[in-house]
Amino acid sequence: MSNNNDLHHPARRDFLTTAGGVGGALAIGASGVASMTLGGPMAMASALATSRYGMGPGLKGPYLDLSTGKGNQLAYARIQGDLDFGKPKYFWFKGYLMGVEPHKKVVDLMGTSGFGVIRLAQGPDGAIRRMCREIIVYTDLRSGEVLDEWKNPLTNEMVKAVHVDNDPFNYLIEEFFPAPPKFGGLNQGPPPPRVPFIMPWYQHGGWAEMEIHIHLAYPNALQPDKWPRESSGPIVQVSEMFAHHVKVEDLQNPKLTTLDYTGTWNRITPWLPWMLMGQRPGFCQYACFMGTTKNLDEILSRPVLDYAEKNYAKYFDAPTEWTEDRSLSSLEHYALRQKPAPVK
């Protein structure tokens, strides 16, 4: 959720960032591989569903060993999309955007709803291509209607709402952590070392759980000299935190080419540029549930879906071809599509 007013992840993005934080070390014990017994599949499922101290046999096999880069690559690819290449998969998120200012209570500002569609394809050298389109729509806290305008309670100014659409947001899923996103060349740095893609997995009974934390700081596409009312400053500081919950039985079932999950997406980001708060101290935080679905009608409200169908029709399907187009966050898209607001 690459909302860099943003960077999906959720990122939606940038799980891809670094192996240095959460996601760079494995929290798996030597719990051993469950073996097939005369009890058959039911006995296998029962054996996998045991855990102690956050560890269990469902993290070691029999299909995927999550202490290896290859095991994590296949697990993450099945969470993100479908290894039956070509099939699309929906993810969704729904929650709130909050405003955080120094020495003041946190304020709920608006609702946030969105979805994306992912299609996987074979990539080079064993990599898996993840091809995605995604949107974020902002809604009124009381009515749930999609915002066209919004009265900022922190400034009492009426502003035009600018929703988020990212097309594409592509990256490779490999046995190693990829390099962080470049965001059109703004996020530069030396290539990181090739670190095995091993995530911090935990097992709680029949559930496997994994978090991804992404922390970024890079030059702002909205520099304050050109965008005085929109810019949070010369450097963008963004963090995203994803939590995924999947059934151990599904995770270790080789017949399943995709995995349903539930979880949360949280994002800390500067004031959204269209809020016109400039470099005022503080920031925004997204707090959302997320998951997968075969039918968006089951999750998202009718006003959100109606708005998406009218304004973002192509976002109900994922890209079918891999492109080398720059995968930009909403902050870079804002700089390309919008004009600076007049200075008051």
Model segments located where?
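N-terminal secretory signal peptides
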Residues: M1-A11, M36-L38, M42
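N-terminal export leaders
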Residues: A11-M36
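Cleavable N-terminal signal peptides
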Residues: S31-V33, M42-A43, A47
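Intrinsically disordered, low-complexity linker/propeptide segments enriched in Ser/Thr/Gly/Pro
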Residues: V33-A34, L222, Q237, F242-H244, ...
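Predominantly extracellular/secreted and cell-surface proteins with exposed
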Residues: G99-E249
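Mature extracytoplasmic/lumenal regions of exported proteins
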Residues: G233, V248-R267, W271-L272
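Edge beta-strand at a domain terminus
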Residues: T262-K344
